[in-house]
Amino acid sequence: VVHEWGHFFSDQMSRDFSVGGPHSLTDLLDPRVAFSEGWANALSGLVIGNDRYIDTSGQGQSSGFSIPLERTYFDSVSGWYSEDSVAQIVFDIFDETSALDDDEIQLSLKDMTVALTEHLPPIAATTTIFSFMKAVEETSPQSSSKLLNLLKSHEIALATDDFDEWGSSETNDASDYTSATGGRTSNALPIHTEMTVGADPVLLCQDAVHGEYNKLANRRFMKMTIEETASYRFYAESTGTGFGRTSPDPDFYIWGTNGTGWAAE
């Protein structure tokens, strides 16, 4: 219940650009999905006061499962595309009363609420572990180095002494993970590709190596800066086939820093 309420809270009081869909700890996910699901898992443990996420189901709630929030699940993936990594990071930051861990940071649920409602919404980047951590850093600037160390412990931001909301310096390209058929994605990075208004077109590739709809590299992200108020035209065309279609029709969405969105389908 807390997990699902968390989705409601983030949608109504903060920002959440997750596309939803099926997910598990072994999935390499769209980073928006990884953040949304991992954060909601951690919230459940924080609110209830349990270092495990517990989900019940069936007649009389007689079945279900639980996931540890203080350690990595035995066959989960690690990285910015992992809901397990996100859950552990969020839980470690805000488990202020926990004596069960040795992490070096303990912020409060009030701090998390401030980060989500005041600092996350104005951030231009989409909702991922990177934009969330930037919002937390703005809430608690003195915790910056500890937040970075926590990211590094989950194979995130390994090659940098700083991090930003875009994941600009990310080097974890998910190449350590293969699909059921032995494939590896080559389209995980950069997380956000720079696009310059008026410049040459940018080639951006997608794939379904690790599954479809909400998995890593199914959708790609770009960023751009508009310097002047004017009318601008954006155009996307396919250069090949994919996802079982002989003639793909690319769709794209444009989001402004104020949260306004435009769809081209």
Language model: regions and residue ranges:
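Zinc-dependent metallopeptidase catalytic helix centered on the HExxH motif
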Residues: 1-55
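Solvent-exposed loop/turn segments at secondary-structure junctions
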Residues: 7-8, 14-17, 90, 96-97, ...
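Short helix/loop segments within enzyme catalytic domains
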Residues: 21, 33-35, 44-73, 98-116
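Second-shell loop/turn segments in exported
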Residues: 25-31, 72-79
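Short consensus segments that form the blades of beta-propeller domains
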Residues: 31, 80, 241-245
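Loop/turn elements at helix/coil->beta-strand transitions in domains of secreted/extracellular proteins
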Residues: 48-52, 85-86, 231
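Pan-zinc metallopeptidase signature
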Residues: 73-196
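Acidic, Ser/Thr/Pro-rich low-complexity intrinsically disordered segments
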Residues: 106, 115-135, 189-265
